[in-house]
Amino acid sequence: MARIAGIDLPRGKRSDIALSYIYGVGRVTALKVLDAVGINWSRSIDDLSAEELNEVRKELEKNYKVEGELRREVSANIKRLMDIGCYRGLRHRKGLPVHGQRTHTNARTRKGPRKGAVGKKK
């Protein structure tokens, strides 16, 4: 099983699809990496040699932030927004939508399950 950036790539999938299983690598980035290394995107991960996988690994490490490094950067950016007390940071802190979406109705994904009205006690 091929392993890149700490992720086991799925067997039997095309190489561009398999690379997109890595956090921070989508289809476009996967195609760019494969093109830079000179591997056809339609080849299966199983068909790639250890040397080719090593070239892909080196290309990702050299030119792209993926997995843990990218996750740390994103969380540090959000923490910085919260520390400086800007509007976006306050929205993150309160767990509300950040990009100006409506919250009177909707926004259930960010706000969590509904808090039901407290019923009359008998």
Curated annotation (Swiss-Prot):
Per its UniProt record, what SUPFAM superfamilies does this chain match? S13-like H2TH domain
Keyword Transmembrane among UniProt keywords: no
According to its UniProt entry, the protein's GO biological process terms are:
translation
The answer to whether UniProt assigns keyword Secreted to this entry is no
**Chain segments carrying region Disordered:** 95-122
List the GO terms this entry assigns under cellular component, sorted alphabetically: cytosol; small ribosomal subunit
Molecular-function GO terms, alphabetical: rRNA binding; structural constituent of ribosome; tRNA binding
Quaternary structure (record): Part of the 30S ribosomal subunit. Forms a loose heterodimer with protein S19. Forms two bridges to the 50S subunit in the 70S ribosome.
- Give the PANTHER family listed for this entry: 30S RIBOSOMAL PROTEIN S13/40S RIBOSOMAL PROTEIN S18, SMALL RIBOSOMAL SUBUNIT PROTEIN US13M
Question: Which family would the database say this protein is a member of?
Answer: Belongs to the universal ribosomal protein uS13 family.
The record ties this protein, via HAMAP family, to: Ribosomal_uS13
Primary role: Located at the top of the head of the 30S subunit, it contacts several helices of the 16S rRNA. In the 70S ribosome it contacts the 23S rRNA (bridge B1a) and protein L5 of the 50S subunit (bridge B1b), connecting the 2 subunits; these bridges are implicated in subunit movement. Contacts the tRNAs in the A and P-sites.
This protein is called what? Small ribosomal subunit protein uS13
Q: Record the organism.
A: Lawsonia intracellularis (strain PHE/MN1-00)
